[in-house]
């Protein structure tokens, strides 16, 4: 009830792998065009520029909030951004924890080389003692047969999580881990991007945005587009649960 989250392994969870993927709004397209190419080649699948599918508002497969931000046109930069040849001026490094400000030295920060965390990095982050870490659950009680009650439940939970993170920032500050790992048949995932945006706005309104970094542990992340949306709306780092789950089950489970 306080928004906190206590870790258990996926094997102990109520839902199986297939049900969890459905709950995270993934389908065959997610695996065929996003996850499989990345796992096989270490890179995204090369395809046509732009987004040729029906816009999400007119699709019968909702597919998550991130799809509402898919571009319908090709966009390039001139000159192109090149993180390899321009490494002196570009970096993916991220500092987690309360940001330092003039006249105040509130503590230390943790520097990571990339905003995409591995299992080892996530465990290390949560086990360290230099920066305070608090967990917040991104789940709500879903009412699949009653849209009005479902909307009320979802909205109330988003407000609750945003308030809890703001309180953590005011009282302690540090790293807020937002997780939907413990989804089950009763408690559905809060839309990741909506929650990140709501928390970000709440922290700005209360004047404590620089006192906390948001780390998102979510199964809703399955592509670079999902990552870009999460980071763009206020997250500092992500831990893509579904992608890592997809590498772990046996071929029979997959």
What are these regions (language model features)?
Residues 162-177, 210, 228-229:
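Alpha/beta enzyme core
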Residues 176, 214-217, 238:
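Hydrophobic faces of well-ordered beta-strands that scaffold small-molecule active sites
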Residues 246-253:
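Conserved small/polar residues in nucleotide/adenosyl-binding loops
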Residues 234-245:
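Glycine-rich phosphate-binding active-site loops on the catalytic face of alpha/beta enzymes
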Residues 191-210:
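Alpha-helix-loop-beta-strand connector modules within alpha/beta enzyme cores
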Residues 222-233:
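Catalytic cores of alpha/beta
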Residues 1-161, 166, 170:
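Extended, highly charged accessory segments
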Residues 178-190:
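Glycine-rich, proline-tolerant flexible connector loops at the mouths of alpha/beta enzymes
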